[in-house]
């Protein structure tokens, strides 16, 4: 169609052809150029046609005509005019018939088939075994349409001749093995015999025929059927065959399970087996029968495989169809059982045995419809549901069982892996199913009590011990090497009487032997891994490894490593050299290295001898389903080795020289230093003396964590380098010097996009290229990416030729000038979307791309998109109204600022439409000249909201424009429907004879093109909630169907139960835009398949995909999310992308040739998944959107490029293409156990890898993808991913991959997936360990007199002053550590910078990097890392991982302080503030510049949520927010409030305590989730023990800093610092308890009475208690300062220690004393109001007060902490909000909007403005009052210290003696102050004979 066609005005509304992105009407300003239709095809006049453009008998070279046969291009291969398309047998009648029921999933067009005698088809050309791959099946051939002279007949005759059959490649071929009627009869017969549903049968018939048609279009029908049977049933890659042999069903069929004797073969049997094997290898097809007789009785896998292939080879086409049909019918109704592929195989096997039996064939009456579902599937479904949900009060409630108690899909499935499992299937009468004859088993399936059959086959226990087993090799490669490094560099530990002044060395044997203990460490790790495996894999399961032998082997190896080392230390006395010991030590070191290497390389599952050895069939199932890894070959394998050799070579070298050697001096000094301290009242100087050794222990532990971190650092660097190298190799980098990407673009379009080899009518390439290029440009114009003047410059135009009367095509100058870099303003708007898209298109075509097949040969594929509640189409209200009270901008305003050029194009377009419509309606010409000002005023509405008239067609345009620039389903559908346009375009361009055939009949041509597109491409949206949509959602869904009639929507339909008390009936239904609309406005479904019950048993998405999966069509599925986009130019590459599956052009081998070895063929590892790139279209919408986009780009592109090559890429959902047959027969496209499979997509990838599939990555194709844009939504996604990784750590997939992958693949898998998250965890862990080390180290430095240090002097020199402590090397370690953490952090930015550099050039990369730095994105990265690790820690400790829907909108609203604080306090702010206090102590105690980095990092943890909050620093909003914070703290105690401090505390606590099940129907119960109580052991490990270690570390530092080091005192002068901690920790708690008892008594006695006259009793009571708690805690802060003798440094460490001790107490109380939380908040309000009698708690009202009192004790301290911390955070923002115009600068930083495009401040009414100002004044006063009080608490004691007597507290005696720290005492006992000054040097010099004796 023309883009200046005035008849298109209303088309964007109904959009019947479904081809546009809303198909806006479009216009051309100038009329002198030739028009183009929607494919970019020039619309030619009849004259032009007569001039020969489309006459096959004439050829052109740029318009020059040649006589037939003399075209010089004929000899040039691709342009050669081969045999005519029409010279094919014309007499093939259409065999299909119409029987009143349309089996196709689309409505046929044209007259019914068989009506006309000439309704004929071109037969497929056989592509098997040796013919051309082209199929003409889809091209209509009408007798008499075109004759040899090129004459045309009546176009109507052509239309009548169109094929009406949806499966032409199969039905039109005379060699089809079975006619379609017979196939249909098979389906109907099976449906009757098994009781399948009729709709399911129709659906599966269409599914099967589409598969046959898809394959027949590129191979012969016979080969298509054979390959399909091989894929589903009998081929080496068929899952059914793999299962059949794994579960030894062949032996069941031969001798019966009951007669099987599995065990070792006798010697005689082994000899016979060897002989048979030789016979099979030498067998030829002729003597197959003889070989079969010879191997009879041989049960080996080879013999079984030979028998199988012989059997398959004898199958007739009828039997093949029947077998596939039966499998598909079982699969189509299997519901949740589709997630258990081997269970489904077992059901199919039983059904197949029954089908082949006489009992089935002779059965007179069919089984009732629904028998298969109700009798076979529903009992299994109900069992699976009962594991996750239980019935409480008549409704289904999620069970509280954790994963290790839930028998999930995988446990159910794995029962069927082994004959021993199948043998456990027992009837109610005790009969084993296997004891029945095979043909009787199917009818007995309904009698099995499944509850008694299934058991756990792997325990997903919530424990960190999974990491010990799964990643044992990682621990060995790090812990053992770290031990060896440290042992070698810590000689002082094993040197007798080491003295630094002499630097005496240890015996050589000791050095060797100590390092050799690394081998023992490795053995210990393996023993621990084996013991953990024992606890995770039940011995009951037949697939469990035999661990006893491995355990004893490991013990022996540990003994071999440990024994000689003990000998060395025992035999070799520490002062006497022994040659024997030296030799043993050295040998043992190399034995240890060998042990270390062996254990590092060998997978745990393959240690000593693999339990899956192929000589026995015992473990074939585990080999098949958990270890069929596709091997890497050639360059890929060497690259994989090279990557990891490089990583670990660099890592071990760098770690040794940088990390370990920086520890050498601190080890020497700290291990030999003993402190001269007075000590503590309770235990003297026992602890303070060894403070250096405690510090050393902490330093070694901290460095140990760093030792893990730098491996990940090197992985990032090496991966990036290799990825960059590959990008240069492929030619996708912008820096690649040898490409002229735009100059060569036309040629590349011709060679890489178009399949021109088989074209019948040959054209000059320019004619074909121009149509493709013009279509791309016009599609961009229609999407308002280009203005009309840009379009004119970019299009190919027809111009007069030099030959008179002829026309030729002129290429746009763009192709030449683009490479000259002078194109910025000439062809595109600068930095526009159009420029990006065309640049990528050009760049991608310069890479190697598989050759495309012709359109009619390409396979059929489906795009599948799950939809839940995402926006379909934005409403007008959402676009032009501010979305909430905190927003300052409407969505439309924001979009206009983000896309100014596109808005301008849209407005111009709309104005033209409005003017034309007005002219058409008024029927008169406009005045020629209007007043310019009036015209501008009239245009204002267009520029503001996009329309002037409120007519639906105008408002809809604006809605569509906004929806196409937001994350909506409409954007996704309009984008991916470009596949349809691309297929039509390619088909039209590559088959010009079709255009000729139709002549001027545009409608007939369009229908033919649509039919081809419909045949090759389906779009399926799984819209599970459609039946429950609200009216506006329904309206939007209906709009989609009208705009895109071929769109298919699968949804869940619900009907009330037939009988009362039963469950409602639920159906999977399918509709499209062709479905009839019923009276109620709904559409009549095409297919409606009943399910066993509600299919949503998991977290939603995977179940949603699974229920819709039965409606997919074709061979491949592309999985897409509802916030993606696609573009026409990318869709043109679809044929090449599908060719990546390596199934289109391969040499076909007969799959059932006997003698082909099982598992030895390269085809045994098909491509399961092809991943693709994503462009994050939200990348420039501010700093956070850009950070999220950058991460996605680097992960999805830069790393995926390398990972795919070295075998480490998995499936991440969108936008991957999957091999549908491979994946659907192996459990589907995702996994669905609730909680465990939270990140559902990645499990499908792991499943594919485990089962032998390959995963590739496609560089030249990319989709668009939206990402979260706000701080909260990005971190919600982060939390979901982190928690999901916690669940993955527990999963069996990680166990199989971790214990069975070869070392290089294992390392790739680990560092690409769990390693990233564990790295984040290690970073946070190292930060906390460092803080603990810093506190102790700086306490040591603060109390010591340090030596004058010169690093260049020998270590044996005497240090001055005499008696000093040389802690400089230890203090300098802080600098080295900081540098390490700094590098680890900044390395995260390397990939994104490199990615930007290679794709967009140096300038863009530098620009983006500095933009990120100036926008403080490093602070966000620090915070996000903490959220990752917090989510992971929390999930493994307490569970509760759940699906968090991610944000799809723009983050322009200011979020209240209270919401941000409550959301991030537990995960980051608390940890940051505790660490900040410790850092403050470290900074004050001993200043070092490197600590500035930690100040920045910890500031990020505390302040990041507020820095990235829009308009956080607007003055008025800030104080109104403060008002909201104060109200948040105080509300919720009188009556429930959704957003209150008490609600936040209760929800946080419930994650540990869990909720009670009792409900009283209160509103407060709605916000509570279903948290179950966490396991107490996990809580002790995760909460109490780390807290106790931290408290102990701080306490040791505190007692040391008070231990009076260097002070000349007596034992009587020892201070009582422990009592200070006890007082300041416990006194506030005791006072709080007293206050609570008083309040409780008062509320119980007078609360109900007061409540009658005072509505706020509860709030007042709570306010009093909370206020006292705040005051008490502040008072005891000052008390600690006083007790520490007004020393600020000592007070700081005292406060830190008190906080840690209180945390420990409260954790213990929560875990050990608190019972479950009620879902309602009645207990809380009753505590303050005294109204216990009306709570509805029943008898619990008697026990609840005690529980509530315990909780309130904790709450008062928490309230004080939140009050103080919240105010501190707000106070620190004061300097920022005082900066003039800070809000504008802050908005520029967040949104990257120029000042001219700034978001305006909101406009308020006078009343609102007055009210706001009054509130601001009031709360501003309160804010400054609190600020003054806080300042007073710090300034007061500091000033008072000068006026307080020096001997304060000296009068205290007894236990309280020295409670106050002495002030102004000298701690310098060095030099002349030493009591042993003169003899000091000599007394510390050892006698020579103590160290140098040599034997």
Curated annotation (Swiss-Prot):
Residues 65-78 have a biased composition (Low complexity). Residues 1-473, 533-550, 604-1579, 1642-1758, 1843-1895 are extracellular. The modification Phosphothreonine is found at residues 288, 291. SMART domains: FKS1_dom1. One of its GO terms (molecular function) is 1,3-beta-D-glucan synthase activity. Keywords: Cell wall biogenesis/degradation, Glycosyltransferase, Isopeptide bond, Membrane, Phosphoprotein, Sporulation, Transferase, Transmembrane, Transmembrane helix, Ubl conjugation. Pfam families: FKS1_dom1, FKS1_dom2, Glucan_synthase. Changing residue 1059 to S: In strain: SK1. Residues 1-143, 269-292 are annotated as: Disordered. It is an enzyme of class 2 (transferase). Induction: Under starvation and during sporulation. Also by pheromones and calcium in a calcineurin-dependent manner. Deletion leads to caspofungin resistance. It catalyses: [(1->3)-beta-D-glucosyl](n) + UDP-alpha-D-glucose = [(1->3)-beta-D-glucosyl](n+1) + UDP + H(+). Signal peptide: none annotated. Residues 269-278 have a biased composition (Basic residues). Its EC number is 2.4.1.34. The gene is GSC2. There is a cross-link at residues 278, 405, 929, 934, 1558, 1566 (Glycyl lysine isopeptide (Lys-Gly) (interchain with G-Cter in ubiquitin)). It is a multi-pass membrane protein. Belongs to the glycosyltransferase 48 family. The chain crosses the membrane at residues 474-494, 512-532, 551-571, 583-603, 1580-1600, 1621-1641, 1759-1779, 1822-1842. Component of the 1,3-beta-glucan synthase (GS) complex, composed of two alternate catalytic subunits FKS1 or GSC2, and a regulatory subunit RHO1. Interacts with SMK1. This is 1,3-beta-glucan synthase component GSC2. GO terms for biological process: (1->3)-beta-D-glucan biosynthetic process; ascospore wall assembly; fungal-type cell wall polysaccharide biosynthetic process. It is found in: Membrane. Residues 495-511, 572-582, 1601-1620, 1780-1821 are cytoplasmic.
